[in-house]
Structure formats: structure tokens, C-alpha cells
Amino acid sequence: MPNKKILVTCALPYANGPLHIGHMLEHIQADIWVRYQRMKNNEVYFICADDAHGTAIMLKSKQLNINPEIMIAKIQQEHYQDCCDFNISYNNYHSTHSEENYELLNSIYTKLKKSGFIKSRFISQLYDAQNNIFLPDRFIIGTCPKCRAHNQNGDNCDQCGAIYTPLDLINPKSAISGKSPIIKKSKHLFFDLPQFTKSLYTWIHSGVLQEETLHKVKEWFKLGLKEWDISRNEPYFGFKIPNTSSKYFYVWMDAPIGYMGTFKNLCKKNKNILFEDFWSINSKVELYHFIGKDITYFHSLFWPAILESCQYRKPTGIFVHGHVTLNGSKISKSKNNFINVRTYLSHLNSDYLRYYYATKLSSKINDIDLNFNDFMLKVNADIINKILNLASRNSNFITQYNYGYLSNSLENSNLYDFFIDAQYLIGKLFQQREFSEAMRKIMQLADKANQYIDKQAPWHIVKQHGIHNKNIALCIFSMGIQLFRVLVIYLKPVLPILSQYSEKFLNTRLSWNNINIPLTNHKINKFDIIFHRINTNQISSIINK
């Protein structure tokens, strides 16, 4: 019987171009956690979708001279394939440009309006007169009014985290034309976020946020919550607001609702899953959002307020991570400091990046640097030299001289107990998303396993003739395989390709439930080398793309 029901989401990739390896950090982090939960017999549903609306998509499709619906459908398939090839175990990968999202969005908006949470008023906006378009926040570039950092977007500063309006920006420019925009008035619709100040303040202190996130969110409360503009003027690609002639829902109105729309789509595919069980206000299901630090405001304030106002449940936890830097510098397409997922996959195994990110990830919100020299050294040292070498050096004798059968007893039961006792600490670290520390503990065990084999030196015992000596050597080699099995069980949430291969090699399913039971008198298969050391040529090919 499953212990718990859990719904996990990743933030929705934007459907205006290919994914780069920085994007994969979140998908990998969430997938490791999800795979661990499934190994512990929890019933987990893991979903994501493409964020498929907004001015950026409209402009991109114009630039490519393609219908935006055709463009987002193509990109959605590319994103999904990238996730599949990184073995991200989604139960459903959908799109916000869907029937389910449209229905939920309109239903929620109607409830908000009926409850008096939608206000309307005229506001001053920046307008690109050359292109006849009101400029979205992300299409206005200027200097942050708080820290004076240059080249910041019109809604928030990625240097100091300040939240502001485009009119607050110093020396704003249109990112479309490069010209200084003019100020123009327009009527907009607002969600009355301040109405939820008290309930949100209580909720953020209920343990749903990391300590670092909580401190940041409390700063926004000190400044005072503001009404949230949920409308955009045409031209725009998205869903029209009911009973308006030229207004569309702001992308950040329909994007979080995309979590619900994607799950509703999954319910259509699987009639045994009931939408209300997961989203009703009294739901006992645990709901977790994995997100990047730059979208904390939307998920910690705007989104739970929308859910509360419509009598839906709020998230159990919001797990925020930092950004990925590449060789010490911010990932930037304009500066050619980025690597697309497809480029990486054309040269290297996805397990390698999954492992490297795991060695860097924790429950903190620190940025993670992908240094390719460190990446190569760590993967070669840990996965190749420590883990796979343990299987390789111990399996040959067993398959050649004992028909693949492991010995019928453990050579060192105390050592085996030491390895399986680590499951409690390692499991706790996985549960708390302290993957870096979990990898460190696992590699300490790998070192201990290899030291045991080095000290016993069964290859020397084999050279001493006699059945007795061969049996002693068999027990030692078998012990090495027993320890390898425990290690790959611990690594299974991180390395799906390696664990799948190891299950074929060991001729058994790798399960946390039977880790205590060794494979005595058990037949294994021949060990084949499917993982290879990373070399500098491969790294150069990726970097130079």
C-alpha cells in the first residue's frame, strides 16, 4: 500500500525556444526527489507543461513567420523530448494553451469577479510608438531604481531582487525597437492581492517555505502587497478575458493555473485519478512546487491567494533553487555563454549531468556553477573509477569460474550491515533534498568497498591453486558485488540509466524495500562496459558547439 499521495510540479518552460542545460537543473532536482519517493512506495504524480502564452511568443512567431499555435506545439514536443532524454519521469507534460487551462482560467476568473476580487482602473504604461505595442515588463530594459544595476527588466531586478513597475525604471528602453518608449494610459484589470495579506502571512509561516525564501517574502510584506495586474492589451497571444473587446489574461495569470490544467488533462487520460482529490480545499494529498528563485513572488503570494479565493487547496511546500552559472559566468544567449540540451546529449550521457548536479544540490538557494573541468574530473572519479570499477573488477571471476553465481554466504556480514545501515541517513538526506551530502556519503561507502577489495586482494588468492582458495576468492569477489548492489540502490534516484543497466547485470530489481537481503547463491550476468570516461575532446565539442 502506498504511504502517501504526492503531486509534484516543475516550473513551466517558456515555449519560445530550446532548453539549455541550466533549465535542466530544476527538472533533475525534482526528478531525483520524485524517484526517491516512488522507491519508498509513495504514490507520486509528477507533471509539467510548456508556458505557451505572452508577447514574447507572439513576437517570436512573427519573426519566424509562423502561426504561434504551430510554433508552440513544435517547441512543446522538443521540450518534452529533452526531458525524456534526461529521463525526467513525468506522468504528464502538457501546455498552458489547452482546453483544460482555458476552462479553469475562465472559471477562476468568474469566481474572482463574483467575489469582488477584480478591480479595474486606468494606468500609465510604456508604449513603443514605432511598433504600436504596449510594452510588457520583460520587454523594457533599464537601470534598477534601487541598486542602479544596468540592463534590468521592467518588473524586477535580478541583482538585488527589488520589485517595481516599469515606470520606476531609470532610462527605460524598448527591447523590441531599442527606442525610448512613451507613456500612454490604458484600462486594466487587477487582482486584489492586499485582501489576502493576513491569511498569506499566516500561511508563509506554516513551514511551506525554506528559511531563506521566508526572509525574502517577509520583505515584500513590509513594503505592502499591491494589487496585481492580470490583463494585457492586444496585440497579444493568449486567452481573451471574457466580456472585454481587446484584453487578454496576463501570462502569469494562466501559467500557475497550468499546473491544474495539466493535472486535469492527466485525469482525462487516467480515469482512476480524481481531480477533486488533489485540488479540493480539504485534500490530504501533498502538493509540492519546484521553482527557481526568480519566480518566488508569483508562487508564494499571487498563486496561493488565487487558490484561496476560489476555495482550492494551497501547496504543501515550495522548493526554491538557485540559478546555474556556466564556468563562473551567468548563462546568456546574447553573450554566447549557454549550451542547449541537444548539444549536450549529442556528446554525453544524461546520467553524468544528473550526477554532477546532484553533487551540487542542497535545500539551500545557492547558485550552482557548472565547471566543465570539475564536471569531467568528478564524473570520471566517482561514477567510472569508484562505482563501475567495483562491478567490473569483481564480476569477471564470478562469470568465468562460477557460471555467474555469487557465493551462498557473505564474506563479511558486519561490512554489509554497515552499508545497509546507511540507508536511514541517506534516505533522510534524499527526503530533505540534501543531495550533495547524500552523494558524499555514498561515495564514502564506495571508497570503503574498493578499499575492502584492495586489502583482500582476491586476485592473489586465485593464483594459489586449489578449490579452497578459489572458494575464498569467490566469496570476496561476491562481497564486492553485494556492496555494488547496495550502492546502486542508493544511486537509483539519481542515475536511471546506470540503475537500469545494473538491474540487467545483477539480474534483479533494485529496491529500497529489499536492500537488507543480500543476493546469495544468485546468478548475475556478464558485466559490459556501457559507460566511458569523459575526455577533453567531448568537453571541447560541447563548449565550442
UniProtKB/Swiss-Prot annotation:
Keyword vocabulary terms for this entry: Aminoacyl-tRNA synthetase, ATP-binding, Cytoplasm, Ligase, Metal-binding, Nucleotide-binding, Protein biosynthesis, Zinc
Cofactor needs: Zn(2+)
Chief location of this protein within or outside the cell: cytoplasm
Catalyzed reactions per annotation: tRNA(Met) + L-methionine + ATP = L-methionyl-tRNA(Met) + AMP + diphosphate
The gene coding this protein: metG
E.C. number(s) listed in UniProt: 6.1.1.10
Designated name of the protein: Methionine--tRNA ligase
GO cellular component, one term: cytosol
Cell compartments where the protein resides: Cytoplasm
Chain ranges for the short sequence motif 'HIGH' region as given in the UniProt record: 13-23
Binding of Zn(2+), residues: C144, C147, C157, C160
Residues where ATP binds: K333
Family: Belongs to the class-I aminoacyl-tRNA synthetase family. MetG type 1 subfamily.
Function: Is required not only for elongation of protein synthesis but also for the initiation of all mRNA translation through initiator tRNA(fMet) aminoacylation.
Aminoacyl-tRNA synthetase as UniProt keyword: yes
Co-factor: note: Binds 1 zinc ion per subunit.
Pfam families in the cross-refs: tRNA-synt_1g
